[in-house]
């Protein structure tokens, strides 16, 4: 029953004509986990990416070619930087015969850090996402980094005789870049403007430093986004950004949140 005649041509259902005449803005695959490598200032970093890939489907085409998305990843062997990621996006459009599409890949990004007093080394992990999109003939590539930090409440410090409440916070920078900017640059901006940065491994002298550093540098969630926004505004490598801060309040069962968006190509 499964035998095929030598001259048999398997039908390509996806490429057949669709009579409903409704275009689909985005169709593809999501949650594809694949090994990948990144070109970083310190060398090539191996990690695992979770990919979402999709393209625009014309109104007269029944379906896209789903297998080609995974085939694209299987063929990709070059370490990714922004330029290579944009090339991957162009390859996808060519392979899928599409005029618009989007690739999003999220991955853990590890940075070796040195403790502030003891000097012990440890790895710190960050959640990084690269997003590339072609629409109306225009290509955009963005990098998003989620940076965990410590924040300490200025009000609590002011009104308390002993100490002040502090908590872990998440800074998220989603930036469109004019140049191949290392993701570490975005991470450092967030860490340097927090009450204190985090480390994977600390000794007792380091804990003392972290506690006192945060106490000497209290910041509301509003302070966090404003101070980081000043850094982003001054950096010519950054064309546009969405900046978010969320403080997981230690004295409440809710978070404090702030957001700033700016596109430098627009006035104001």
Swiss-Prot record:
Enzyme category, top tier: hydrolase
Keywords: Hydrolase
InterPro entries reported for this sequence: GTP_cyclohydrolase_FolE2 (IPR022838), GTP_cyclohydrolase_FolE2/MptA (IPR003801)
Site (May be catalytically important): 153
GO MF, one annotated term: GTP cyclohydrolase I activity
A GO biological-process term: tetrahydrofolate biosynthetic process
One Pfam family per UniProt: GCHY-1
Pathway involvement of the protein, from the record: Cofactor biosynthesis; 7,8-dihydroneopterin triphosphate biosynthesis; 7,8-dihydroneopterin triphosphate from GTP: step 1/1
Catalysis performed (reactions): GTP + H2O = 7,8-dihydroneopterin 3'-triphosphate + formate + H(+)
Record-linked Gene3D superfamilies: Urate Oxidase
E.C. designation(s): 3.5.4.16
UniProt superkingdom: Bacteria
Family from the record: Belongs to the GTP cyclohydrolase IV family.
PANTHER family: GTP CYCLOHYDROLASE MPTA
Function: Converts GTP to 7,8-dihydroneopterin triphosphate.
Protein name, UniProt field: GTP cyclohydrolase FolE2
Species in which this protein is naturally found: Ralstonia nicotianae (strain ATCC BAA-1114 / GMI1000)
Recorded name of the encoding gene: folE2
């Amino acid at each position: 029953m499964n035998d095929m005649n030598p001259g048999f041509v398997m039908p390509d259902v996806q490429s057949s004509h669709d009579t409903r005449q409704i275009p689909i803005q985005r169709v593809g695959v999501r949650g594809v986990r694949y090994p990948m490598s990144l070109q970083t200032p310190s060398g090539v970093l191996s990690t695992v990416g979770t990919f979402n890939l999709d393209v625009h489907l014309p109104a007269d085409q029944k379906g896209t070619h789903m297998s080609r998305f995974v085939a694209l990843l299987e063929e990709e062997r070059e370490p990714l930087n922004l330029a290579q990621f944009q090339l991957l996006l162009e390859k996808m459009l060519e392979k899928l015969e599409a005029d618009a599409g989007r690739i999003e890949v999220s991955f853990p990004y590890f940075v070796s850090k040195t403790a502030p007093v003891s000097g012990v080394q440890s790895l710190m992990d960050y959640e990084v996402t690269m997003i590339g999109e072609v629409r109306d003939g225009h290509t955009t590539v963005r990098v998003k980094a989620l940076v965990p930090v410590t924040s300490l409440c200025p009000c609590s410090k002011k009104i308390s005789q002993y100490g002040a409440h502090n908590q872990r916070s998440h800074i998220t920078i989603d930036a469109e870049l004019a140049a191949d900017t290392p993701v570490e640059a975005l991470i450092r901006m967030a860490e340097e403007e927090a009450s204190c940065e985090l480390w994977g491994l600390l000794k007792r002298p380091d804990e003392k430093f972290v506690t006192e550093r945060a106490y000497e540098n209290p910041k509301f969630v509003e302070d966090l986004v404003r101070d980081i926004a000043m850094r982003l505004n001054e950096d010519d490598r950054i064309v546009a950004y969405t900046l978010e801060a969320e403080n997981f309040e230690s004295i409440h069962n809710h978070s404090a949140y702030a957001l700033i968006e700016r596109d430098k190509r627009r006035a104001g």
